[in-house]
Amino acid sequence: DKESVCIFGEPRLGFLVSAGNMDSMVNHYSVSKKRRATDAFTPGGVMGKRPDYATIVYCNLLRQTYKHTPIIIGGIEASLRRLAHYDYWSNKMKRSILLDSGADLISDGMGEHSIVEIADALNSGLAVSDITFIDGTVYKTRKREDIYDAIELPHYEEVLADKAAYARSFYTQYCNTDPFVAKRLFETYDGKLFVVQNPPAKPLTQSEMDQV
């Protein structure tokens, strides 16, 4: 319901969107693709309170109403779909959720650091399109020259056509998950759009964890 998002009003900094603490498709379907009878993350176990591919649905609704308001997505659904990925439910390779959702940024993984840095940047007046420097985030750009010190992954069109190319891409991603040594990664769409994954955010210190 498009009108439902108007209840919030336009935020000062931006919208934060998550599908919840489980991927909405895993939550809705069994491994045999049968619809689950109950939803363990909804009061009363009621099924159907969230849509399939919830992050995409929520963001598309927001973008229809708030054309220029920053949208930042996070949580396990967005994090696991941050780059081109195989979608078991449709048996297809899909683009980064950043593109299909229309969001501006992904706060990837544990976002205690990145979400504060994003808020500080927006609060300072920085455009969301210029927030490209925060560890633990994924952004999109059309400016190849602005992507530095990065490993180029196989293009989306390559992984779409070749399983081996996807395996190489996944291996490179896997080898760059350590926040202390990981490199920046990026993949190309249609030769002109780039999705860039910054290195993971550093882990929290003991005092930071205590504050959380």
Question: What is each residue range found by the language model?
Answer:
Residues 2-190, 197:
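Glycine-rich beta-alpha loop elements in corrinoid/cobalamin-binding modules
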Residues 204-212:
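Long hydrophobic segments that form regular secondary structure
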